[in-house]
């Protein structure tokens, strides 16, 4: 029996573990799924993970759960059965099991808090018997034709590896300076109801991570909040049917040119704020936007001075701005895991990529199964698969399709997922 190791025990890991468990119950041979996690299942949706205080609302519909969109194409003539079995671990099934389904309906099907979403994921993980090895991965190495995940206490060997999560939220431009908060430090203060009181506050970043922090900052005693991002303005994420369908059904995504895909991602996913956050921004005259990239930060005379670089035509302009408090919400490094690779593993990866490791090279090399092409043993990177495979895979928008793609590559060519399933539809 082969083994699939997953770095992180979040929503993607739970979705893959659930699908593997159901397939195993159906008599289909699938790899053993082992998640290696430093804190706990769904930790990034709790205050302990550093990315939230747990009290804010989920930005994605909770019905987009671990099985969504319930359109499996893994087991010929049994895909409807697979979908039906997966509904046992749906959001609705969790609410029924916890005697809260009727209340959720009567309240208008509200988005759950991050904490409640983490409880749902933990419920699924418990019910499918998900294997979790607790420990922080210190190195990702290759031994023969297998991966080796080294923690301080143990080593997990696997035939394939999937890396998930945004990394750690502790990074900061000025570590140790009390006027410069990392994402984790900000949410720790919010979770402990430690009110921020400052005249001029800056938030670095124009994506959903920064948007969530702005949503929290509204409640604190600050005179002005400046959002710093390289975009021309604070764009609103497209949230209509046509935009959402790109996330749920990526069938037509490969037919788009790279330029068209990048344009779609820019409008719907990267560096954009949700419409609900934008509505709050409109109502608060403390919010301002400053265009530029932060190139330098220094603490001077009780302030943080940020140097911003802005391209204006052919000219690169640098300006300096002072703030009483700065929150680095620029988001996670897409290559946060790169320092974990052993030299041999890095050489193997760069050989497959045909050049030095970079985010752009990796994104363009992700195949249909969400793994890096021409690299053995397999390395699944769903968080970098948006450009080539569709915008829903890096987030929560199509966890059921994600598990199909990953597990489908382990079932052999006869069971490899079809581009679209025409013969079966499983109603919910």
UniProtKB/Swiss-Prot annotation:
Coiled coil: none annotated. This is L-lysine N6-monooxygenase MbtG. The gene is mbtG. The keyword Oxidoreductase applies. Belongs to the lysine N(6)-hydroxylase/L-ornithine N(5)-oxygenase family. GO terms for biological process: biosynthetic process; intracellular iron ion homeostasis. Residues 1-20 form the signal peptide. It catalyses: L-lysine + NADPH + O2 = N(6)-hydroxy-L-lysine + NADP(+) + H2O. Flavoprotein monooxygenase required for N-hydroxylation of the two acylated lysine residues during mycobactin assembly, thus producing the hydroxamate groups necessary for iron sequestration. Is also able, but less efficiently, to hydroxylate L-lysine (non acylated) in vitro. One of its GO terms (molecular function) is L-lysine 6-monooxygenase (NADPH) activity. Its cofactor is FAD. It is an enzyme of class 1 (oxidoreductase). Pfam families: Lys_Orn_oxgnase. Keywords: FAD, Flavoprotein, Monooxygenase, NADP, Oxidoreductase, Signal. It comes from the Bacteria. Pathway: Siderophore biosynthesis; mycobactin biosynthesis. Its EC number is 1.14.13.59. InterPro entries: FAD/NAD-bd_sf, Lys/Orn_oxygenase.
